[in-house]
Amino acid sequence: MTYVVTDECVKCKYTDCVEVCPVDCFYEGEFMLVINPDECIDCGVCVPDCPIDAIKPETPELIEWVERAKHFIEHEKWQVITKKKPALPDADKFKDEKDKFNKYIGV
């Protein structure tokens, strides 16, 4: 099992979670973060640090987020992020919106 970053992160990209990760398994894209499922040690220490509850344990319903993370890391060459940065400028505007991945990224 791994943890996954879900739709809530899209267009917000709060990075509070990255500094607490003991194995540096967060990767950064333009509009969101992902967790590398091959590097995550399933500790869950990042979960309470996400202000929008975007990080969840992998379940069969969330497997698509594992596959998306792999795609972005392997094919889009997203890079590791280990230091907190400011959230995206309009994060507060988008934080409660639903289905953001399909609307804004759609891979």
Curated annotation (Swiss-Prot):
GO terms for molecular function: 3 iron, 4 sulfur cluster binding; 4 iron, 4 sulfur cluster binding; electron transfer activity; metal ion binding. Keywords: 3Fe-4S, 4Fe-4S, Electron transport, Iron, Iron-sulfur, Metal-binding, Repeat, Transport. It comes from Rickettsia bellii (strain RML369-C). Residues 2-30, 31-60 form the 4Fe-4S ferredoxin-type domain. PANTHER family: FERREDOXIN (PTHR42859:SF2), OXIDOREDUCTASE (PTHR42859). This is Ferredoxin. [3Fe-4S] cluster binds at residues 9, 17, 50. SUPFAM superfamilies: 4Fe-4S ferredoxins (SSF54862). Disulfide bonds: none annotated. Its cofactor is [4Fe-4S] cluster; [3Fe-4S] cluster. Ferredoxins are iron-sulfur proteins that transfer electrons in a wide variety of metabolic reactions. Binds 1 [4Fe-4S] cluster. [4Fe-4S] cluster binds at residues 21, 40, 43, 46. Pfam families: DUF3470, Fer4.
